Amino acid sequence: MSESEAEETKISTEPVDNAWSMKIPAFRQEDNPHGMVEESSFATLFPKYRERYLKEVWPLVEQCLAEHHLKAELDLMEGSMVVKTSRKTWDPYIIIKARDMIKLMARSVPFEQAKRVLQDDIGCDIIKIGNLVHKKEKFVKRRQRLIGPNGATLKSIELLTDCYVLVQGNTVSALGPYKGLQQVRDIVLETMNNVHPIYNIKALMIKRELMKDPRLANEDWSRFLPKFKNKNISKRKQPKVKKQKKEYTPFPPSQPESKVDKQLASGEYFLNQEQKQAKRNQERTEKQKEAAKRQDERRNKDFVPPTEESAASSRKKEDGSSSSKVDVKALKAKLIKANKKARSS
């Protein structure tokens, strides 16, 4: 190993501000000269409609995996793909990458794109969206939002995240750098939760422009990003008069008094039938007297003479209003006009 390579492989213990800027150290054959001790294998099933395509490209798949000392098998009877390590395999993680490649190919990703996952700085993410929305109509509508008219929305997501994105059935397959995969997952999940992807696309476009300015590298970008308010108003009708909740008490409410309890409290319970009847008659006559008294007061209200003080005060008001209403000048002009008529006659 040369001095320059030794300097590159030195492990830094200093704090890192941006983890995405760190370079992933390369894993070479010299790092694992003895190879793998045990054989590892992964298998995945594929649908019937992918059988013809996989049969055509399988020689290319075997050739690609042979470069990494891996074996590949295609079982058309069972409908499965298998990848295995060999005695010459020296990279312990390449079998995981090969497993991801055959998973992507089973999800209708073309071989030219799927083989990119074997690179160190490229990863993949298969996002399951089938169980995020309960109604099928809503699911189809929101999934179509991801694609957009003529695939425009999907193309813009690919350009902004540097990822290959494929919407297929109940899954969204993404392939690209790890930071881009994180952004794709956020956009997909928010879209299925009824947030239009154009909002996240706008935010990514603004972030891309801000990254070009070195002065804003250590600043908070939230003030530049658009803030969208939810305009979906609840369709539930609110009551005009809302009942206020009573204060919580750990004790149960007191038991309401029964008729017998009320009779015991008033002493009526111990009376015989005749005494009870007499008491009821007495209460009835008292109520009738009160009602007759109120009726007489209402009838005699119009015949009650006003008090002297009120009569005097009303007279003063009338005098004041009449004196204030008299116009002296108009009265004088009227008298002069009457005198002129008398003289002329």
Swiss-Prot record:
Spans annotated as Disordered: 232-260, 273-345
> Per the UniProt entry, what are the Gene Ontology biological process annotations, in alphabetical order?
rRNA processing
An example Gene Ontology CC term for this record: nucleolus
Coiled-coil stretches, from where to where?
270-298
Per the record, the major location class is nucleus
Composition bias type Basic residues, residue spans = 232-245, 331-345
- Locations of Basic and acidic residues compositional bias? 276-302, 315-330
Please give the family membership noted in the entry.
Belongs to the KRR1 family.
Its subunit composition reads: Monomer. Component of the ribosomal small subunit (SSU) processome.
Q: What is this protein called?
A: KRR1 small subunit processome component homolog
